[in-house]
Amino acid sequence: MIPQLFVESIDLGDGRNITIETGRLAKQADGSVVVRIGKTVILGTVVSSRKATPGIDFLPLTVDYREKFAAAGRFPGGFFKREARPSDSEVLTMRLVDRVLRPLFPSDYHAEVQVMIQLMSHDEEVMPDALAGLAASAALALSDIPFETLISEARVGRIDGKFIINPSRAQLELSDIDMMIGASTDSIAMVEGEMKEISEAEMLEAIKFAHEHIKVQIAAQERLAAAFGKKEVRTYEKEKSDDAIYAKVKEAAYDKIYNIAKVGSAKQERTAAFDAVKEEVKALFTEEELAENGDLVSKYFYKTNKEAVRNVTLDLGTRLDGRKTTEIRPIWCEVDYLPSVHGSALFTRGETQALATATLGTSREANQIDSPSQQGEEKFYLHYNFPPFSTGEARPLRGTSRREVGHGNLAQRALKNMIPADCPYTIRVVSEVLESNGSSSMATVCAGTLSLMDAGIQMIRPVSGIAMGLITDGERFAVLSDILGDEDHLGDMDFKVTGTSEGITACQMDIKIDGLKYEIMEAALAQARDGRLHILNILTETLATPKVDVKAYAPKIIMRTIPGNFIGALIGPGGKVIQELQKATGTTIVINEVDEMGVVEILGTDPAGIEAVLAKIESITFKPQIGEAYEVKVIKMLDFGAVVEYTAVPGNEVLLHVSELAWERTENVTDVVNMGDVFMVKYLGLDPKTRKEKVSRKALLPRPPREEKKE
C-alpha cells in the first residue's frame, strides 16, 4: 500500500510554485519533507537523540547539506567516483541554515540533533541553497523535537530596481543585490549577502521584501503540519537548577563584576579580574557542594557576568574596554610589509590583527568550481586562516574549519565587485589572523584592500568593514561599533557591514533575540556607515591610491587576441613551440579559446621576455595582404632563389623565386641580391601550382618596354 502523501504549495507570485510534501520518504526520521520547484527536489530530514549528551552544556546541533552529483546527471570526480568531503559552497549553505536554527532550540536542550538536507534532483534555473532553510524548518515542524518557532530562508535579488525572490543564477548575473535572509514570522534572524554599493535604505527594503515572502513559506509549513498531524512535543530532561545557588552567586559577584566592567581594561587584565571574582565565589561553597553543583556555580557566574556587563553598557554607555558605544579602537596599518610577495598589508585594530597577501597569476590559477549545482571558475578568491595562537590558545590543527570558510567567503564577497572587470590577473588574497579580539573578518577586508592596492590592482574604490553589536533589555538599547569578542558573546546581535564611500558591498547579520525592530536595524546601519567611513579614511591615509604598476618582482601580464586558426601554430606539435618559447623567454603562456578566437595570456617578470613572446606571436599570426608591398631581408641564398623574412615580423619567412627577382632573365641569384640585402616585395598570395606563398621583387620594378621583332 502506498502511504498517503501530504502536500502544500507556495506561490512565489511570478508563475513559480514551491511544494512541500511529506508522508512517503524517510519515515523513520523524526521529521522529513521533500521540497520541489521546477525539476529541483530537496530531501530534508531531522533526527534527535532521546537523551542529552552527558557532560555538555550546549546544543550539539549538526546541519549537513549535500548536493548529489546524480542530481545533475553527472559522475563525481576523483579516483573513487564517490561524493566525499563537502565543498565550500555546501559548507556555506550549512552555516546559513545552522545560524538561523540554533538560537530557536530551548537553551537547556542538550540532546544531539542532526539536520540533513540533500539535493536529489537539480534544475539549472533554481539555486537550491535558497530552499535549504525551508526544508530544515519544515522537517522540524513535523517532528516532536522542541523548537521555539518555525523559520524559512529566501534569496533576494534586484534587477533594474525591481526585487526578485529566489532568482536564478542567470538573473543574479544582472542583479545588484544577492542576499539570503532567514526569519520567523515576527523577526529577522539572519542576513548575509553581497551588493554593488547600495545604500542602507535599499538594504532594509530588500530585507523587508524577503520577509514578506518568508511569512508565506512559514504559513505553508504550518498548514502541512496541521494536515499531517503535529506530534506532541517530546519531554526531555531539563537542566538542573537551584534558585538558592543562583541568588548566592549573584549577591557575591554582581557588584564586583559591574565595577570591573565600568572601569574599562584590556582583555587579559579584565579576564584575570573576572577569574579572581569567580574564585572568590567558589570559595563560598564547600568542596562537597562544588563536587555536586560546581557546574551550576559556573553557569550562574556566567549568567551574572553577562547581566552585569550588559547593564554597565545600558546604564552608563561604557564598554568593557572603556570605550563609548560609537568609539572605534585605535588603528594602525602598514603596506609592503613582506618584501618578496606581490602585495601585502598589515591591519591592526585594538587587539585584532590581520596580515594579508595578494598573489597575481594567469587564468590557469583560477579557482575551479565543480559542483552539481554550479560549474565555473573564480578569478578572484580569498582564503582566511585563524590559527589558535591568535587567541592565545594551543589546540590541534584539523584542517580548514567551517568558520574559516565562512569568514573568508564574506571578505571575498566584500572585495570582489571592486576588482575591475578588465583586470587581466587571477588574484588570490590570503588573510592570516595574528591576533583576535573581535571582528577578524572585517580586519581581513581592510587588510585585503590594502594588499590589493599595494600589489598594483587598480581597485574601483577601496573597501572597509566594521562589526556592530547590540545590547537591549526590551526597553533600552545600545548599538556598539567595532565589537570585542566578549561583546559578541554577551550581546544580542552581530552585524558585519562592508562598503566603499559610495555604498555597501557585503553584510552578515546574526540576531539572537526575537522582535528586533526595523528602527533598531536602521540605527545600527547608520552607525555602521559612520564607523566604516572612519576606518576607510585611515586606510586611504596609509595608501591613498593603488600603486601605478605591479612590483618589479611581481609578474606582469599582457593579453593578446589571435584568430582561432592560429592557436595550433602557436602551441606547435605536442606543445613544442609554446614550451620552447616559455623556456627561452622565462614566461608563462596560457591560451584560451573564446568565441573562435584565441585569448593569449603572457605572464613574466622580464619585459624583454614578454616582448620576445609578443614578437613570436606577431610572426606566427602575420598574414600579408595580396597586392601589398612589404620590406624583406635576405636570410638564405639558394640556387633557385632567396629565402627572405619580413623585417616587421622576424622569423616569418617566404621564398623569393629566381623568376621573380627581375624582369630580365637571371642566371645567378647573386647577380641581383645577396645575403643581408633589404628591399621591397609584393605579396602575390598562394601559387596555384605549389600552394605556397609567393612574393615578387620585379612586380615593384618598372617593366622594360617590349623589343619589336625584326622582319
From Swiss-Prot:
Domain KH as annotated: residue spans: 555-617
Residues that, per the record, bind Mg(2+): D488, D494
Highest rank taxon of the organism: Bacteria
Record EC number: 2.7.7.8
Keyword Metal-binding belongs to the record: yes
GO MF annotations, alphabetized: 3'-5'-RNA exonuclease activity; magnesium ion binding; polyribonucleotide nucleotidyltransferase activity; RNA binding
Gene3D superfamilies linked to this entry: GHMP Kinase, N-terminal domain (3.30.230.70), K Homology domain, type 1 (3.30.1370.10), Nucleic acid-binding proteins (2.40.50.140)
Record field: catalytic activity: RNA(n+1) + phosphate = RNA(n) + a ribonucleoside 5'-diphosphate
Subcellular location: Cytoplasm
Residue numbers spanned by region Disordered: 691-711
Keyword terms of this UniProt record: Cytoplasm, Magnesium, Metal-binding, Nucleotidyltransferase, RNA-binding, Transferase
Keyword RNA-binding set for record: yes
Ranges where the S1 motif domain occurs: 627-698
Enzyme class, first EC level, given as a word: transferase
NCBIfam families documented for this protein: polynuc_phos (TIGR03591), PRK11824.1 (NF008805)
PANTHER family for this protein: POLYRIBONUCLEOTIDE NUCLEOTIDYLTRANSFERASE, POLYRIBONUCLEOTIDE NUCLEOTIDYLTRANSFERASE 1, MITOCHONDRIAL
Annotated function: Involved in mRNA degradation. Catalyzes the phosphorolysis of single-stranded polyribonucleotides processively in the 3'- to 5'-direction.
Family according to the record: Belongs to the polyribonucleotide nucleotidyltransferase family.
Stated name of the protein: Polyribonucleotide nucleotidyltransferase
Organism listed in the record: Flavobacterium psychrophilum (strain ATCC 49511 / DSM 21280 / CIP 103535 / JIP02/86)
Organism classification: Bacteria, Pseudomonadati, Bacteroidota, Flavobacteriia, Flavobacteriales
Gene: pnp
